[in-house]
């Protein structure tokens, strides 16, 4: 059975989708943008480092609502507006995800919603 996740402190989705869902032992966190807690139509201040920290914080909150932590993440997908930002993203990512690190995909995209620099989704197992 599938259940929707709506974590407190995570801004409402900017489209018709859940912040995340659970299906059995799996937890799926929807792509998170570095949006403001006060306004889901506005990005936080800062560059790629701050935006990466924000999306991981949001993912962490969604996972916590489902009883998971970042160490339960099995796979992530990062969407970057500029692949040249990957080194900065990797620095934040390495600090937040423990070994063994999740499997990961990185995709450069032509544009992200709200002109964000990064978006991330993940799959975790509880």
Regions picked out by a protein language model, each given a short descriptive name:
Residues 2-126:
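Short, polar/acidic, helix-capping and beta-turn segments at strand->helix junctions
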